[in-house]
Amino acid sequence: MDHPVIIEAAINGTAPKTRNPNVPRTAAEVHDDALASLEAGAAIIHAHNEQIRWIGQEAADDYLAAWRPILEARPDALWYPTGVIAESIDVRLEHTEILATELGPGLRMAY
């Protein structure tokens, strides 16, 4: 029997290159791995930015470096970033509001 399946690719987590030299950390590496995952059938990409402690604009800028070209190539992609490490939920999610503003109404960001 056939069942629809939604594949999510969690492409990097918080693993540093010292633990796994193949983990995508830079914007170029995240871009390449995300597009490869989408081409292989993933519907959703989950990726952390380069530094989990970055907040606000700094976190958003890092995501945007990778995700602007990904979403230009694959506007149908579903993407969700991680929350950042912070005391309050407002600070933890501040970068997502910036991303939504920067990327506009066509953004498909899950959370």
Give residue ranges: language-model regions.
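Alpha-helix-loop-beta-strand connector modules within alpha/beta enzyme cores
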Residues: 3, 9, 55-82
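N-terminal small/glycine-rich loop or linker at the start of catalytic domains
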Residues: 1-22
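Hydrophobic faces of well-ordered beta-strands that scaffold small-molecule active sites
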Residues: 7-9, 45-47, 77-83, 108-111
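Extended substrate/RNA-proximal surfaces in nucleic-acid metabolism proteins
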Residues: 88-111
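Conserved, mostly hydrophobic/aromatic
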Residues: 30, 37, 48, 110
